[in-house]
Amino acid sequence: MTILRKTHPLMKMVNHAFIDLPTPANISGWWNFGSLLGLCLIIQIASGLFLAMHYTPDTLTAFSSVTHICRDVNYGWLIRYMHANGASLFFICLYLHIGRGIYYGSYSYTETWNIGIILLFLTMATAFMGYVLPWGQMSFWGATVITNLLSAIPYIGTDLVEWIWGGFSVDKATLNRFFAFHFILPFIIAATAMVHLLFLHETGSNNPLGIPSDCDKIPFHPYYTTKDFLGMILLLAFFFTIVLFFPDLLGDPDNYSPANPLNTPPHIKPEWYFLFAYAILRSIPNKLGGVIALIMSILVLALLPHIQTSKQRSLMFRPISQFLFWLLVADVLALTWIGGQPVEPPFIIIGQIASLLYFTIILILMPIAGIIENKMLKW
C-alpha cells in the first residue's frame, strides 16, 4: 500500500516541505525563527481579519471605530492588542532571523536571501500602513512625515506625494487606500514566503558550522517539528505576557489622542522597530541624502553575498568578525535608542557616528576582517 502523504498531489508538497525534508543534524535554536515568523503571520492575518470586520476607514469614524472594537466587541480589546503587539513580535523574530543569517553566512544562498530582503520591505510597508489606520496623532503625523520623504525625489517628487495622498494632504483618500493595501499585503507576504521556502529547499538549510551537511541529514519530522513546537509555545508565552500585562509597553501614548492636523506632537517618531532606520534618515542634514541612506540601510543587506572575503562561511571560528558582528548589533540598538530621542545635542552627533559606523562595519570592516582571518590561517 502506498503512503498517501507521498502520493497525493497536495500532501506530497507538504511532505517534501515539512515531513520528509532532509535537514542538517546540527542546526540550533536560531533556525526556529523561520517557523516562528510563519506563526506571527498567521496571528496577524487572523486577528487583522476580525479587526477589519469592525473597522471603518474614514477620517471621521476611524478612531472611534477602534475605540468601539476595544469597548463593545466581544474580546475586541484582546484582538486589537494581539494585532498591535503581534507586529512588534513579528519584527523581533524578523531581526533575529536576519541576524542569524548574517552570523552563520546564510546570505550565501543568494536567491533565498534576496527574497528575504523583499519580504522585509513588504513587512515594513505593511506595518507602516497599519500604524496609520487607528488615526491617532502619531498615525496622522507619521504618515505625513514618511510619505513626504518621497518629495525628495527630483522633478516628480511633489506630484508623486500628492498622487499617493489622493489630495493635498493626508486625508480620507489616503486612509482608505492605506487600509486596502494593508489588507492585501499580508497575503502577498504569505505568497512571497512560499517562494522564499521554495528557494531554500532547492539548496537545503545552512548549519552553524557553515559546511556542507549532505552526509549527515535527518528527517524534519519528528526531530524539528517538536523543536519548532517548543519554540512556538515559548513565543506564545512571551507574546501573551506582553498582550495581557503590558499591552501599551511598545506603543506611543500620542496615538490615544485623535488625529489633529492643527496640532503637531513635540516628537514625531515611528514605532520602535523602525527607529534604527529613522535615526539613519535623520543623521543626514540633506533630505534626498537622508532618504537614500534610509533605503540603503536595508538594501545594504543585498550586498553581503558579494562582499564576503572570508573562505569560511560561518562566523563560528572567526573571532575578529564575531567582534564586529556584535559591535554591529550594539550599533543598531544605539540607533534604535537615538531614533526615539529629540533632534538636539548630544543626540545628533551620536546618531551621525552610529549611522557612519553601521555602514562602515558592513561595507568596509567585515570584508577586511575576512581577509585578515584568511591570512592568519595561511589560506
Curated annotation (Swiss-Prot):
List of residues binding heme b b562: 83, 182
- What GO cellular component term, any one, is given? respiratory chain complex III
A GO MF term? metal ion binding
**Cofactor-binding details, from the entry:** Binds 2 heme b groups non-covalently.
GO biological process terms on file: mitochondrial electron transport, ubiquinol to cytochrome c
Q: What interactions and quaternary structure are annotated? A: The cytochrome bc1 complex contains 11 subunits: 3 respiratory subunits (MT-CYB, CYC1 and UQCRFS1), 2 core proteins (UQCRC1 and UQCRC2) and 6 low-molecular weight proteins (UQCRH/QCR6, UQCRB/QCR7, UQCRQ/QCR8, UQCR10/QCR9, UQCR11/QCR10 and a cleavage product of UQCRFS1). This cytochrome bc1 complex then forms a dimer.
Query: What is the protein name stated in its UniProt record?
Result: Cytochrome b
Question: What does the organism's lineage look like at the top?
Answer: Eukaryota, Metazoa, Chordata, Craniata, Vertebrata
